[in-house]
């Protein structure tokens, strides 16, 4: 229901694109949260838009904010907070009072999706869940080299770099089974 309530959805994973193809639909292709976020940052820099940043560890968000100030001087930082907070209502009030044009939420899936669904109506901002993009932007994590991305195996590179993701990656074969079950049995 959270996903159905979203205003926009993107295929941030080759599995979604392949699953749609198996089911007879076509998607324009994979659109990563990181690529979307950096394109929006560039546009916000040119248009002097206000952004609120929420998520990641404190040292990550602090480093990222400094890099954004240096790289995108036209962006107005409406506010920011790390992803470790107990008083959700206080964060929501802070976001609301800062009147941002965009809210980038990096709390991880599915926490960020639930947070956005619950709170996005407190402001007219565009809210976007962007997973671990703050870590990449801050330099605490790296994206796969372009070759891996071009060959749709960025997930394999991430597994190689972060073997602790193995259990999470086990959801991928389960997803594929669900796609085929739906294709052949309609359930």
Where are these predicted regions, by residue range?
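Short, Asp-centered acidic motifs that coordinate Mg2+ and/or phosphate
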Residues: 8, 102, 126
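An alpha-beta-alpha
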Residues: 44-71, 171-185
């Amino acid at each position: 229901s959270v996903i159905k309530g979203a205003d926009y959805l993107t295929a941030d994973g080759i599995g979604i694109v392949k699953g749609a193809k198996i089911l007879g639909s076509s998607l324009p292709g994979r659109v990563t949260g990181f690529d979307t976020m950096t394109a929006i940052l560039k546009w916000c820099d040119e248009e002097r838009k206000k952004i609120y940043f929420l998520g990641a560890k404190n040292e990550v968000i602090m480093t990222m904010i400094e890099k954004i100030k240096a790289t995108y001087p036209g962006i107005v930082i409406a506010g920011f907070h790390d992803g470790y907070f107990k008083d959700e209502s206080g964060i929501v009030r802070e976001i609301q009072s800062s009147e941002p044009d965009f809210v980038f939420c990096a709390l991880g899936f599915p926490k960020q999706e639930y947070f956005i669904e619950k709170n996005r109506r407190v402001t007219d901002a565009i809210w976007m869940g962007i997973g671990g993009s703050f870590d990449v932007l801050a330099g605490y994590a790296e994206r796969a080299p372009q070759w891996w991305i071009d060959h749709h195996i960025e997930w394999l590179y991430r597994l190689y770099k972060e073997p602790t993701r193995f259990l999470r990656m086990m959801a991928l074969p389960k997803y594929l089974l669900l796609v085929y079950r739906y294709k052949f049995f309609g359930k």
